[in-house]
């Protein structure tokens, strides 16, 4: 797509990211692993709306947009990377007069797309100062205009001039009215609030509230759609069809439970709340099954065929009882509550607890070699003969990557082999405990799961009275025990555990965050005998004192991580703190908060991300911290020392929905593919990834390489040296042995812009990169050819 309006956004605070964050991925610009490239991974199986513009069918799925070329059947994806101006799409609609597509975003942004794929952005509503929602509830196209139903009234948008023409406050004395639906019949505009019908002649002064006349709607709870048809205004309310004619409402009983109306060309369809398909509304307002096809959300007529937006099968084209399904590749759920990489396989789990994504259908998604594998809730529940909700964590067998376990916050522990269910574990067939003994089917809460170095599977079981820690041996034997405070022998009750973190210094040390109720941290030392708790030592702390003697008592703990310096990072509901390696957790409740000095000459400091809810912390190959917050997007920070030896915090990047393609500022989870440095952000609106400039360092230089290699004249991106050891210095020289530039690695890679130390593009030729570790004990050499 082409942009006809370019909007300036806030620059990222970074020394590495360029203004051209979205690198061109055409053949001329070399596609694999392009630095700083974003890629959206959206669930496209459930289609909410469709619209046709010329030979293109647009489909809205889970707030994201893709299209199908009716001639070539090619699928294209449309997002901020391709020119759209925001991320969370609420509605799409086709203007037949201009043959243009309107895209309406949840935040009030509007894009208009014509037949040539040119995009014009209308941001007036987005920038409007208003405390009420800017979400567009409904759209009615009329000639060259679009009438928008808003929570404060009606907006008239001139699509030809690409501007908002007027805003109508239609309540008494021009007060705000929440308009849910809008339609036009015979030059009369009909705007529906929840209980009242507002009407006015389209040519009247609609800005004058006195021209708007009111009448009651049929009594009911929910309006589910409105369309003009057969000289009547038709609505669906409380699953029943009603029509309005001569100022009178008439109910049209049906044996079906209706849930919406869709008008396409001269036909009106009702959508039903079951698997029947779409029923055509006949001129006498009787119903006739025209398109028998499962659960349909939207329908568009195209000659002798219909295009359907379906619940589970993507977009479907049907003609003469022949059906063709269009399935874009991707996950099946946009909730990425937890993610975890095992080598190059990424597991994505939709789950949650408390008020966060709670009661999400249990589904398993994993991404490997560019391909998504999805296991639906229906497949899993059919195999288990048991409902499954809120998948929380995954543990993959270190000896067989196809064998893994999934924990659930309510429905037990699921054992899988590839895509097949092996066993569902509940209290009736395992040592698991239920938080509600009388309802084990819904309250068997498991969260943390991991394999230790001996091949034992650890599971933390929330809410049971006794034996909350389970260790399953490689032979399948269950061993269950309590955590006991070492000095008092008091039982440490596990209410809501987080993930188990195995300490890098000693695999016998397990850090266990207790997230709420008895919020705190437990350090368990199992003495190398995890199935025998008698020699265990557990230390449990709920409060700490920072370097300024401030008392820290977290209300909630959401995440912990350990960096390459063995510092433990703790993310809470109000910021973060650290437990450096030199502090002995078993003997001291000391901690440190990360502070940022103000640049105002006062020498005052602020704590890093103070009062932010920290959902996740992940450490990359360069020991930098990727931090996901509940409201402010994602941060990439680096901790060092200034010239005076004081802690120096460098914010390398801060990604939000305003300055990047990030899908939501609520970042639920982050996972990094160690081999490539690609960072995956699981948000409340879906999953998106970003190729960073750091990967895990290698143990030697045996796998060193450069890419792209050769570098063609059309390539404008970075040259990347991969397979480096930690703290590698890369000295680039030309064929005559002259020094060109010196680079330093971020973990296992270093990037070069193809310029010399004076900022000039180097000449064509073969360049040698001599790589040395900081201690000089190892070196490697790689060559790269540059053609200008």
Q: Where are the model-predicted features located?
A:
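Positively charged n-region of N-terminal signal peptides that target proteins for export
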Residues: 1-4, 788
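Carboxylate-rich, polar loop motifs that coordinate divalent cations or form catalytic acidic clusters
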Residues: 4, 20-704, 730, 739
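Sec-dependent N-terminal signal peptides
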Residues: 4-13
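Short, surface-exposed loop/turn motifs with a glycine/proline- and acidic-biased composition
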Residues: 80, 745-776
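Terminal processing/anchoring signals of secreted or surface-associated proteins
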Residues: 693-697, 706-709, 737, 752, ...
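Glycine-centered coil/turn sites that cap beta-strands in beta-rich domains
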Residues: 699-731, 749-752
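Short, glycine-anchored, charge-dense loop/turn motifs used at functional sites
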Residues: 729-740, 767
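Extracellular and select intracellular beta-sandwich modules with Ser/Thr-enriched
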Residues: 778-782
């Amino acid at each position: 797509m082409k942009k006809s309006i370019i909007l300036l956004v806030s620059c990222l605070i970074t020394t590495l990211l360029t203004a051209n964050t979205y690198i061109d991925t055409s053949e001329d610009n070399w596609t694999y692993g392009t630095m700083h490239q974003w890629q959206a991974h959206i669930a496209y199986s459930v289609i909410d709306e469709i619209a046709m513009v010329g030979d293109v069918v647009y489909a809205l799925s889970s707030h994201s947009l893709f299209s199908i070329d009716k001639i070539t059947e090619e699928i294209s994806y449309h997002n901020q990377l391709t020119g759209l101006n925001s991320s969370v799409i609420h509605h799409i609609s086709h203007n037949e007069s201009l043959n243009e597509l309107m895209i309406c975003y949840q935040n009030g942004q509007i894009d208009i797309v014509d037949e040539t794929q040119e995009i014009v952005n209308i941001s007036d509503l987005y920038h409007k100062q208003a405390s009420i929602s800017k979400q567009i509830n409904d759209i009615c196209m009329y000639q060259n205009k679009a009438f928008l139903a808003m929570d404060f009234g009606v907006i008239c948008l001139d699509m030809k001039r690409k501007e908002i023409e007027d805003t109508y406050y239609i309540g008494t004395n021009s007060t705000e009215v929440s308009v849910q639906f809008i339609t036009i019949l015979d030059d009369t505009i009909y705007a529906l609030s929840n209980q009242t019908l507002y009407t006015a002649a389209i040519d009247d002064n609609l800005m004058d509230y006195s021209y708007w006349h009111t009448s009651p709607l049929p009594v009911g709870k929910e309006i589910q759609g409105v369309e003009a048809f057969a000289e009547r205004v038709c609505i669906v309310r409380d699953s029943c069809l009603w029509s309005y004619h001569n100022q009178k409402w008439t109910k049209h009983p049906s044996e079906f439970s209706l849930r919406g109306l869709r008008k396409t060309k001269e036909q009106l369809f009702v959508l039903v709340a079951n698997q029947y398909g779409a029923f055509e509304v006949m001129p006498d307002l009787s119903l006739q099954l025209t398109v028998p096809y499962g659960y349909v959300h939207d329908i568009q007529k195209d000659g002798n065929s219909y295009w359907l937006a379906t619940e589970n099968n993507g977009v479907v084209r049907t003609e003469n009882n022949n059906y063709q399904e269009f399935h874009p590749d991707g996950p099946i759920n946009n909730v990425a509550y937890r993610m975890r990489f095992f080598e190059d396989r990424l597991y994505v789990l939709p789950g949650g607890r408390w008020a966060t994504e709670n009661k999400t259908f249990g589904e398993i998604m994993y991404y490997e070699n560019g391909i998504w594998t999805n296991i639906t809730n229906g497949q899993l529940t059919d195999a288990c003969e048991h409902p499954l909700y809120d998948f929380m964590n995954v543990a993959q067998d270190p000896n067989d990557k196809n064998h893994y376990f999934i924990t659930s916050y309510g429905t037990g522990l699921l054992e899988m082999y590839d895509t097949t269910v092996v066993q569902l574990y509940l209290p009736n067939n395992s040592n698991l405990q239920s938080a509600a003994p009388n309802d084990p089917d819904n309250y068997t809460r498991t969260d943390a799961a991991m394999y230790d170095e001996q091949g034992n599977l650890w599971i933390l079981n929330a809410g049971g009275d006794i034996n909350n820690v389970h260790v399953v041996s490689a032979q399948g034997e269950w061993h269950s025990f309590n955590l006991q405070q070492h000095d008092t022998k008091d039982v440490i009750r596990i209410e809501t555990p987080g993930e188990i973190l195995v300490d890098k210094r000693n695999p016998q040390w397990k850090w266990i965050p207790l997230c709420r109720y008895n919020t705190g941290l437990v350090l368990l030392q199992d003495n190398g005998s995890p199935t025998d708790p008698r020699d265990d030592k557990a230390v449990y702390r709920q409060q700490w004192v920072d370097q300024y003697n401030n008392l820290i008592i977290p209300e909630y703990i959401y995440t912990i991580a350990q960096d390459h310096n063995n510092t433990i990072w703790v993310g809470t509901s109000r910021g973060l703190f650290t437990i450096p390696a030199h502090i002995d957790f078993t003997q001291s409740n000391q901690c440190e908060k990360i502070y940022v000095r103000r640049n105002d000459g006062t020498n005052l400091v602020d704590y890093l991300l103070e009062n932010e809810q920290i959902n996740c912390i992940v450490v990359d190959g360069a020991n930098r911290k990727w931090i996901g917050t509940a409201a402010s997007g994602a941060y990439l920070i680096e901790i060092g020392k200034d010239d005076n030896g004081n802690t120096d915090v460098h914010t390398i990047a801060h990604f939000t929905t305003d300055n990047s393609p990030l899908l939501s500022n609520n970042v639920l989870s982050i996972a990094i593919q160690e081999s490539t440095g690609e960072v995956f952000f699981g948000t409340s609106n879906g999953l998106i990834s970003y190729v960073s400039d750091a990967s895990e360092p290698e143990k030697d230089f045996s796998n060193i390489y450069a890419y792209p290699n050769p570098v063609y004249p059309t390539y404008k991106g970075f040259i990347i040296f991969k397979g480096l050891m930690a703290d590698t210095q890369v000295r680039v020289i030309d064929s005559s042995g002259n020094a060109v530039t010196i680079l330093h690695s971020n973990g296992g890679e270093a990037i070069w812009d193809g310029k010399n130390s004076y900022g000039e593009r180097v000449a064509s030729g073969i360049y040698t990169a001599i790589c040395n570790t900081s201690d000089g004990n190892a070196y490697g050499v790689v060559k790269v050819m540059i053609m200008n």
